[in-house]
Amino acid sequence: SQLMFLQSIISPWLAENLINAYPNVVNDVANGTLKEIDYDLVKGVREFTWNKIKEKIINNYLISDIITMLKPLGVTYTMIKKLLFDEPNPVLLKQQLEDNPYLLTKINGLGFKKVDNLALKLKPEFINSTERLVAFIKYYFTDLGDSKGHTWCSVKILKSAISNNVPECVDKVDWLLENNEFLHIEDDKVGLKYYYDIEMQIYNLLLEKSK
């Protein structure tokens, strides 16, 4: 796990060279027991580079557990920054991710399927959960907005998308449509309340300007 952590903050070959010479380098630097290294033992590292590496280890050490857990997804420190903005405490963030891995759908570029695969490995019991259904619906509408410029669809189309992507959650759809605070439903149209509120703000601003 120390190698995985190092590879997420410095180049993979450099991480391997360091680990080969100092197998416990991450813990030792974080604990303050390793301040200097023998540069002859580590190819490609001199004083300036070593100081930069030490700084990165210390800054990222608190989130090393999270980085190691999410490395199979290709999650980097930069991606985790968005989650840390919402929850700055790494210990609490890790707990939240373990409780509901679908929080990762907040990270741009991961996509629902990648997150879903990891989430079901961490929490197989989430296969037919409300958390999984909510995460898919939020992702579906965000993707719809980004790729096609639409912020809503018919209830029928949404149900079809759910059936095709998270069929195990189908029996929770009707309940969720009636008991949620994140969707706006009008007649047969459904979309994220967040988008609806923004559109209404823009509409009201334009209305005011036209007077």
Predicted regions: what is each one?
Residues V134-W152:
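Short amphipathic alpha-helical interface segments
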Residues K148-S163:
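Short acidic, hydrophobic short linear motifs in intrinsically disordered regions
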Residues I63, T76-M79, D146-H150, E168, ...:
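Intrinsically disordered or highly flexible coil/loop and linker segments, enriched in small
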